[in-house]
Swiss-Prot record:
It comes from Shewanella sp. (strain ANA-3). It catalyses: UDP-N-acetyl-alpha-D-muramate + NADP(+) = UDP-N-acetyl-3-O-(1-carboxyvinyl)-alpha-D-glucosamine + NADPH + H(+). The lineage of its organism: Bacteria, Pseudomonadati, Pseudomonadota, Gammaproteobacteria, Alteromonadales. The gene is murB. Its EC number is 1.3.1.98. This is UDP-N-acetylenolpyruvoylglucosamine reductase. Belongs to the MurB family. It is found in: Cytoplasm. It holds the Pfam family FAD_binding_4. InterPro entries: FAD-bd_PCMH, FAD-bd_PCMH-like_sf, FAD-bd_PCMH_sub1, FAD-bd_PCMH_sub2, MurB, MurB_C, MurB_C_sf, Oxid_FAD_bind_N. Pathway: Cell wall biogenesis; peptidoglycan biosynthesis. Keywords: Cell cycle, Cell division, Cell shape, Cell wall biogenesis/degradation, Cytoplasm, FAD, Flavoprotein, NADP, Oxidoreductase, Peptidoglycan synthesis. Cell wall formation. Its cofactor is FAD. One of its GO terms (cellular component) is cytosol.
Amino acid sequence: MSFPYSLKPFNTFGVEQSCLSLIEVHSKAELQSACLSLYQSKRPMLVLGGGSNIVFTDDFNGTVVRVLSKGISCSEDDTHFYLAVEAGENWHELVQFSLNQNMPGLENLALIPGTVGAAPIQNIGAYGVELCDICDWVEYLDLASGNLLRLTVDECEFAYRESIFKGSLRDKAVITAVGLRLPKAWQPKLAYGPLQSFTAETVTPREIFDRVCEVRSEKLPNPEVLGNAGSFFKNPIVSAATYMQLAARFPSIVGYAQPNGEVKLAAGWLIEHAGLKGFALGNAGVHAKQALVLVNLGHATGQDICRLALHVITRVNEVFGVKLEAEPRIMGLTGETSLDV
């Protein structure tokens, strides 16, 4: 079977796989039309944003729909700014836009790769802020009915790297636009690492933005130089009792207390202290500067990356008794599959 359309330019791991057909949509109407037609034909379909959260382990025997719809509209009331953003907008460019319009609140989420439409699926987050903190609504195409529907932030069932779009609406919905709600009474979020040196009373949104960009650029390799999908593993959440046991054995372990009493562990710390920082398996490697990131060292296949990920998961579990979970979607011949190759 022939797969004439290369997907290498459209996935940040730079994996060389192809697909049967490729459609680029530049408006919400085109996105609706293309996705409904494909859904009704019952052919495999993959809706792709920036390709920054995906690992292709095979050619895709179906149609890839690249979402390139653009548009940002702004409004406000006495207390909030509101942004309605089309799914194909670049996330980091949206962060820059909001700052330039003096609408702060997104600065902690600077330099997260990908599109706005992909952001709600895994409830993107960084440096103490998650999408759910600033999301107002999510509009999506209901594939079964063909209708555009809108969910409130509560209806999205957001959790750490989770949402209804990974749950009951998986494969049933295509996100078309996202609404954001930014308080005019801006309050800096400075709880995490490199932001703790700032003073809440004097820091500006631009200073936070610049620091986040600086730190991410230092730690995360440029995908155009070294293929990667950013953080490959979720930070595991454990009980307070488990954390205390681990801290007794590993006093320098990094953990962040959660509102419900559980503790979020730093997956990068676990990987590094399992001796895997800079480790390579074939053409896939654990990044030498940030162990949370897996990289394509040159001509790695999706299978290479998955094999390395499974090795990391096994080793961390052996050392710490903690099971890591992969963040990216693993795409096989006809659709999403599991990490096991």
